[in-house]
């Protein structure tokens, strides 16, 4: 399949590495390192400031809800002992173990243009992530309240960029079946471009993964100031899938499909 820029989707690979190695330690804490400040300056963030203390879990919430680059880089820097190249090597090794064949990871957050992937690989990565209960729980929240920190006197509310999760603010994007998702870029307002979105939805026991890659901003016809083309196409796919397909019993064991004559039986002539 076609290789595309991964952008913020790179965080799914960082989250996969965190959960693979630290799923039972998510309430451990770390201090946001100053060393990553210049790299993530003026990019997608959750206002997690240098020397503030966070749990691994809080960093994951920031990544999933706000596509926060400082959360990804800060956690990677901490867990790798400052060896970000080593962290990236682990990302690529795990990616290959998961089964990806057309992805390359060059940083922990997606700022670097060398991060590339494809629809099939993102499907494999998301399916792997869905095996972790913590990921499923974190992905499904429309908002997360970040506790007060050293440089934040009051808690702050992180509103998920996945508008499909919010009944109150998601508007036409909202779908009750949406379970979670991540985009490569947030949205387009005065600028233009393409967007990718990887997500999953569930209804009546049926789960589908959606990997919509490089949707042009012009395809979003909902009319909002912020255009989310890949999310627009995703929710339309969700509608089509659940309107079109349903889980049916493969075979009713009490239903007779045919009658076969039986020879040499004293009890019956047919089965």
Feature map (PLM): residue ranges:
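Domain-terminus/edge residues, biased toward the C-terminal soluble/receptor-binding domains
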Residues: 100-101, 113-117, 121, 126-271
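Active-site-adjacent loops and short helices of periplasmic peptidoglycan-processing enzymes
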Residues: 1-120, 124-133
């Amino acid at each position: 399949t076609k290789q595309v820029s991964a952008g913020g989707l790179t965080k799914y690979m960082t989250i996969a590495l965190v959960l693979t190695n630290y799923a039972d330690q998510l309430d451990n804490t770390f201090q946001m390192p100053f060393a990553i400040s210049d790299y993530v300056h003026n990019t997608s963030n959750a206002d997690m400031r240098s020397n503030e203390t966070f749990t691994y879990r809080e960093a994951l919430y920031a990544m999933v809800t706000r596509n926060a680059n400082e959360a990804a880089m800060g956690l990677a820097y901490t867990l790798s002992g400052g060896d970000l190249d080593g962290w990236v090597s682990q990302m690529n090794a795990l990616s290959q173990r998961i089964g990806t064949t057309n992805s390359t990871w060059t940083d922990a957050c997606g700022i670097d243009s060398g991060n590339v992937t494809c629809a099939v690989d993102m499907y494999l990565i998301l399916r792997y992530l869905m095996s972790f209960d913590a990921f499923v729980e974190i992905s499904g929240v429309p908002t997360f309240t970040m506790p007060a920190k050293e440089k934040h006197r009051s808690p702050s509310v992180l509103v998920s960029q996945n508008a499909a999760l919010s009944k109150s603010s998601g508007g036409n994007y909202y779908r009750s079946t949406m379970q979670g998702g991540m985009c490569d870029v947030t949205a387009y307002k005065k600028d233009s471009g393409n967007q990718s979105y990887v997500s999953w939805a569930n209804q009546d026991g049926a789960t589908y993964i959606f990997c919509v890659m490089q949707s042009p901003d012009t395809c979003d016809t909902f009319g909002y100031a912020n255009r989310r083309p890949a999310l627009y196409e995703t929710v339309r796919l969700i509608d089509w899938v659940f309107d079109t397909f349903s889980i049916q019993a493969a075979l009713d064991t009490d239903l007779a499909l045919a009658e076969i004559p039986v020879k040499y039986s004293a009890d019956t002539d047919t089965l």
